Each structure stands twice: as structure tokens, then as C-alpha cells.
Amino acid sequence: MAVAALALLALLPQALGQHNSSYVDYNVEANPDLFPQCLDTISLSFPDCQSGPLSKNLVCDSTASPYDRAAALVSLFTLEELIANTGNTSPGVPRLGLPPYQVWSEALHGLARANFTDNGAYSWATSFPSPILSAAAFNRTLINQIASIISTQGRAFNNAGRFGLDVYSPNINTFRHPVWGRGQETPGEDAYTLTAAYAYEYITGIQGGVNPEHLKLAATAKHFAGYDIENWDNHSRLGNDVNITQQDLAEYYTPQFLVAARDAHVHSFMCSYNAVNGVPSCSNTFFLQTLLRDTFSFVDHGYVSGDCGAVYGVFNPHGYAANEPSAAADAILAGTDIDCGTSYQYHFNESITTGAVARDDIERGFIRLYANLVELGYFDGNSSSSNPYRSLGWPDVQKTDAWNISYEAAVEGIVLLKNDGTLPLASPSEGKNKSIALIGPWANATTQLQGNYYGDAPYLISPVDAFTAAGYTVHYAPGTEISTNSTANFSAALSAARAADTIVFLGGIDNTIEAEAQDRSSIAWPGNQLELISQLAAQKSDDQPLVVYQMGGGQVDSSALKSNAKVNALLWGGYPGQSGGLALRDILTGARAPAGRLTTTQYPAAYAESFSALDMNLRPNETTQNPGQTYMWYTGEPVYAFGHGLFYTTFNASSAQAAKTKYTFNITDLTSAAHPDTTTVGQRTLFNFTASITNSGQRDSDYTALVYANTSTAGPSPYPNKWLVGFDRLAAVAKEGGTAELNVPVAVDRLARVDEAGNTVLFPGRYEVALNNEREVVVEVELVGEQVVLLKWPEEVQGVAGDE
């Protein structure tokens, strides 16, 4: 028997111990019981294409196509060897000199699941802010820089055998409902414009471009599709079967995945745990073949990985398959190429014996994975002449970390929610605010700064460390914890506040209550944090500033702080990464000026209690008491709106476009014109939204611009409140009259809407295109003529995925 098969047999008792007759109730339990080897971070090495057993095989011929090279490799496998390598932890084929490989690496906001050393070289990698904070900068270049640095560090670790060549990132699900525990991993609640832009910049940064000569790392767009709940009300993500209309699928739950495939050319997708409309995502031919490959133009030989344990989930808890061999067969035939788990490795033999699958079905998925590894230079030796990324090493990790982009991302993303003029604080060197009370469960945070999916960082700078280093006399007292109701430490916090010139409370939420497999039950401030803030506000003197930092990925209802005149300023700081303390400090002191904007809506606490978080319908519905979801459809009054963010200065916007009566475009002319620079006619620029932005205040500052569209005449009713069509960030607009020119292209398809059948349609009618929530500049646009379908939504038919 092949060595690879023997290696897997050694693990069989553990695997069977998992999958026995006393099944875990995964309709409630949200963590899959993965066997230890699935979680392994193995030492990686490269095939020897110079003198090893594969050296004469086509896989080692760099002039052949990636597909032909991968197919030639797979043709050498016995059936047992092929099946043994279909999981994320692949034992390789020792007789062929093919080393073990681990598909599962993470790079959400830095390297995770890397083989870090205890100290010295390869003992850390840069820990960036969580995506929800970086996205709040509304800076596409920044996201690309972050991803590029992550991929450089990933390749350096890979060359040392400490990290894989493909990563299970980015998470581009939308932060639809505020209780979601993994919203921190995403860019926010807007799908096509914000999340799609984030996906494009992150993926092209990770992969080294759109169509790079040398693929840097292979990114994975996850989780496809309709995944945005962990365990709300004891409904496990592993067993959720969500109902989504074709209209909402096309309009909200998949457009960012379309951009990832069609435009960014992502090399991998991950299918999700949940089922949609009765079909588990990893056995959903409509998702994995009809949409991804036939409609979204997923790259040739791009591969699909199941989320870890999701193939098993087709059987338990979904019950879509009668047993685990049938689940494995359903998934591979639908288009799930690699199983992050063990179902393929342990049950394909039975699936083949029963005739449910053939060797060709299994080969198809494995060839796709290894065609990617070919493109990544896995078989091309150690020479940098064959692949420039093979020369990267520890000095490149140190060099890219020294660029300080983690700090930059944090300061650019922090959002100023409220300010009565107290901020920025005067510095100790000016003879004011020499002492500061840092109070709250985030005041001395270190590991908390990283959020989830983090690796070892070079350093973690807490707020206490940062203010101490700046020369402040720091009075630190936690006062309370994230979720406690104990007031035992209130008195120490109140004493610290009385001893200081300035009070800063740092609290909110963290990964103890929002995390993978853990949703929140409420979006109110947890525990007794608001009570402590109220007491701090009540005792402070009128000339003593009280500033509150609301931390964490999800929003909490801060209406009590918004209305309390004694709370002088309120900011949102997310999970700010390794330099978080410095970023939080520098925003308060004015060393840097805030220009971030919320990428989610801050709802009143009652919102999360008024309807089911499993209601995936975006549009308001009186019957279900759904008040509408996201800024596009919410019918209530938010505490702070999507896109809200204040500055330390005053900006004025003016535009010659706004003086124009109206732009009129003929739909037939628009959709029949040549578009040599874009993949589709819908991606053509309709017009450029322009404005002059003048800083009339007293501080230099970046300016963030969000451009929205709205209509009350075009397309089907109901009509959304508005939707984002573009954004930009203007850097360092000079104070006292400095001016910068804003130019945001608005594509044809940004004015399109989605009909009930899921088709993306350009409808005739009148539209307004406006700058920011304040509508500082408004341009009127009219589309005339007959409506035109820009993207036809395919009919859902479940079947077997075809060959390429």
C-alpha cells in the first residue's frame, strides 16, 4: 500500500471517533469538531525538479501550461495516493518526491497559521488592523499596500518552509446584521462598491496583480455564499439553511464575489457552511458551476475549497446527503475541489465503489489545486531567476514591517463620531493635559488590539504604553470588564479620574463576545460600562475633558453617549493592530487628524431585538417586523449612519457639475458603445463626479468622499434610500484655504438596479448622485430609452458540474 495511504490510515481511528453514531448537534453547536491533523501547520518543502523522481515529468517543464503540468503529475498517482491528497492536510507522495502540503493558511490582516519560531528570524509578522477598521479609511491604495506586504511576508515565510502558498483570505461576506460575530473580518455592510473594491485591492495585492507573470500567493474569496450568522439564538452556522430571494442574491450577497472572480481574477473560492434555499453551499452546483464558472468567469483552473468541515456538513447537520460518502460525492460533483477536513480522504473509496464518483471527478479538483501551485512556482526550484519571489527572506519581513503601514491603516480608519471642540487635546508640552486617566477594559489592551485570526506580532503597543511614552502622567484603572456587572473597581477608576487633567475611557466589545462561532445577543454596550462612564461624567469638572473610545468590530448603541453633553467626544477604534495604542493616542492629541467613516450602520439597541437575524431579506417587511437592513433599506433613525465621520477641520465642497441642470444619457447608446478598456459595457465610466474640496479650517487633514445614488422613479419599487457608487480619500488637504480636486468615476452599472428575477438592469428614470450623507454636492442624471439587462441572472438548476 502507498505510504500516503498508510499515513492516513494511522489517523483513521481519530477521524472515525469524530464521525460516529452519536452525532454532535451541529444545528446548535457552531464549532466543527475537526481532527487534529486537519489543523496541523506542517513544515513545508519543495519538489526537487533538478534530480528528484519528478524531474523527467512534464510537471517540471516550465515551458508547459500549468494545467498540462498538473495533469501530468496527477497521472502518476495511484488511486489511493490521489484520494489521500484531497484534504487540506496533504501527505504528498513520497515515492514521487512530492512533499506534504498544507492548503490552509490564513492572511486576514497578517500571517496566521504560520510556523513561527520562538524568537529571532520568522518569530513574527506584521499584525495589521482588522479589515473593518482598515476599510473605514476608504483608501483603496492602502488596502492594496496591506495585502502586498502580507504576501511579501508570506512568500518569505514560505521560502523558509513556514507558510503555504495559498491563503484562506479575504472574507468578503457583507456585515448585514449587527450581531454577527465575524463582521470584524469584513469591510462592512455595503456589497458592490465598498466590499467589492476591498476584495479587488486585497486580492490583487496578495496575488501580485490582476494577471501577474508570477503569481505571488493565491487568495481565496470566502465564504460563498449567504454566510453572515454564527450562533444567533442557538442557530448554528453549520446547520443554517437561509432563504434568500434571487433579487437579494444578485444585488447583495454575491456581487463582491463577481468582482473577485471577473475583475480581480482570484484563484480560489471557499464554499460556506450554510445552505441557501435548501441546498448546502458546498454541494450547490448553481453556486459553484453556474454562477462561479459560467457567469462570474472564475479563472481557468481556479479551485474551490470547502470551509473546514463543510463537506461533512452536507451530511450532518444538513441531511442533504444520506451519509458521509454520499456527502463527499455530492460536494466533488458540485464543484468543491478540495475538502478542508477528512470526508474526501476517508470516504472517496466507498463513493467510487458505489459508482457515485469516478477517478476523473476527483482528478479534476486536484489538478485545479496543483495548476495553481505550478503558477506559484512550487515546482520551479530555488532560483530567483525562475521566480523572483523565491529570493524573499527574513530581511524582507523586517523591511516591509518598518514601512509602518499597520500604524497608517489604524490612524486612517479611526472614526470621530462626536466632538464638541474638545479634540484634539492640547499636549503636555503646551502646559496642559499633563496627566491623563486611562480607564476601561481596553485601556491597557495588547492582544485585544488584534481582533481574530491573528499571528505573532513584533510588538503590541497598548494605550497605556503609548501615552506614557509621550510624556503623560498616566493614571490607569480598568474600572470594569467587557461584560461584568461588578462595580468593585469603580471607586479606583473614579479616583484615577479625579487625579487627572483628562479622562479617556476605552471600552466597547472584544472577542470575548464577538468572534467566530459567537454572535452577540444584544447590540447595547455590554456589562456596566455605560454606568461607569455615566459616573465619570457626573463627577468631572466642566473644564476636564471626557473622551470615550468605542472599540471592537461591531457597533454598539452609543445613543446615551451621543446625548450626554458631559461626554465631550466619542470615537470608534475597531481592532487597531500592533501599533493600536499609538494610533489611538495620536488621533486624540492631533498628531494625526481623523478622516475615517463608518462602514456599518450604528443602530439603536432595539433594532437587534425587533426581528430575526436569520431574516436575509434586505427590504422592509411589516409582517416579519423587518425594518429594512443596511443603510440602503433601513427605515428607522440610526444612532450614527453608515458613512458618518467628523473631522478636526471644516471642509467645503463646490462643483460646476451641480450647476448644470441635468445629465441625460440614452441607454441604447450607452450599452452599444465599444468598451475596449473594460470587461463589460456596465463597467464603462458613465461620468466623473467632480468637486473642489477646500479646507477652510485650522488643521491639515485628509478628506474622505462617499458618492451615493438614489432614485424614486427608476426600476421596481420599493426604492432604496440610496446606494454607494464610489469613494475616494484625498490626502493632507492644507488648512486655511487649501484645495484638492475630487474625481470619482461613476460606472454605467453603478446606476443599475436588480429586478425580482435577479437580473441587473439599467432602467430609464431620474437619479441623483450626491456627495456624502450631507449631500454637499448633488448632480442630477436622467437615463432615457428602453431598459437593458446588463447581467442576466441564470436559472437555478442543480446538477453535476461539467469538465473545463
UniProtKB/Swiss-Prot annotation:
Catalytic site: D307
Gene Ontology molecular function: alpha-L-arabinofuranosidase activity; xylan 1,4-beta-xylosidase activity
Glycosylation, residue list: 20, 115, 139, 234, 243, 349, 382, 404, 433, 444, 485, 489, 621, 652, 666, 688, 710
Pfam families from the UniProt entry: Glyco_hydro_3 (PF00933), Glyco_hydro_3_C (PF01915)
Sorted UniProt keywords: Carbohydrate metabolism, Glycoprotein, Glycosidase, Hydrolase, Polysaccharide degradation, Secreted, Signal, Xylan degradation
Enzyme Commission no: 3.2.1.37
BP term (GO), one: arabinan catabolic process
Pathway connected to this protein: Glycan degradation; xylan degradation
Catalytic temperature dependence: Optimum temperature 70 degrees Celsius. Remains stable up to 60 degrees Celsius for 30 minutes, but loses activity at 80 degrees Celsius.
Lineage top rank: taxon: Eukaryota
SUPFAM superfamilies from the UniProt entry: (Trans)glycosidases, Beta-D-glucan exohydrolase, C-terminal domain
Effect of pH on activity: Optimum pH is 4.0. Retains greater than 90 percent of its original activity between pH 2.0 and 7.0 at room temperature for 3 h.
Catalyzed chemical reaction(s): Hydrolysis of (1->4)-beta-D-xylans, to remove successive D-xylose residues from the non-reducing termini
Subcellular location: Secreted
Signal peptide: 1-17
Family matches, as Gene3D superfamilies: Glycoside hydrolase family 3 C-terminal domain, Glycoside hydrolase, family 3, N-terminal domain, Immunoglobulins
Family to which the UniProt record says this protein belongs: Belongs to the glycosyl hydrolase 3 family.
Protein name per the record: Probable exo-1,4-beta-xylosidase xlnD
Species whose genome carries this gene: Aspergillus japonicus
